[in-house]
């Protein structure tokens, strides 16, 4: 596959994730959009690593680290969302101000 096709795909995923993150009112949807952004970045890492220096695996290794951090972020984020849902009975971002009530 050519470099331009992969970069267009990555830019599309990044823009969809960014749009969803900005317009989302649900915390779970915002976490999913954040994961979409991180996956677009991983595609860029692997693509540029393969395109510019295919003998070294720096982009792939860095991508694995980003995946591990994203998994930890998703676990912590979902734990926070479930805690807020138990207390507030809602996962809407504008209703999750914990300083009220």
From Swiss-Prot:
Domain of life of the source: Eukaryota
Reactions catalysed according to its record: a plastoquinone + NADH + (n+1) H(+)(in) = a plastoquinol + NAD(+) + n H(+)(out); a plastoquinone + NADPH + (n+1) H(+)(in) = a plastoquinol + NADP(+) + n H(+)(out)
UniProt entry tagged with the keyword Protein biosynthesis: no
Biological-process GO terms, alphabetical: ATP synthesis coupled electron transport; photosynthesis, light reaction
CC per GO annotation: chloroplast thylakoid membrane; NADH dehydrogenase complex
Main location: plastid
A Pfam cross-reference name: Oxidored_q2
Any one GO MF annotation of this record: oxidoreductase activity, acting on NAD(P)H, quinone or similar compound as acceptor
Membrane topology: Multi-pass membrane protein
TM ranges: 2-22, 32-52, 61-81
Role: NDH shuttles electrons from NAD(P)H:plastoquinone, via FMN and iron-sulfur (Fe-S) centers, to quinones in the photosynthetic chain and possibly in a chloroplast respiratory chain. The immediate electron acceptor for the enzyme in this species is believed to be plastoquinone. Couples the redox reaction to proton translocation, and thus conserves the redox energy in a proton gradient.
Family per record: Belongs to the complex I subunit 4L family.
Name used for this protein in its record: NAD(P)H-quinone oxidoreductase subunit 4L, chloroplastic
Gene of this entry: ndhE
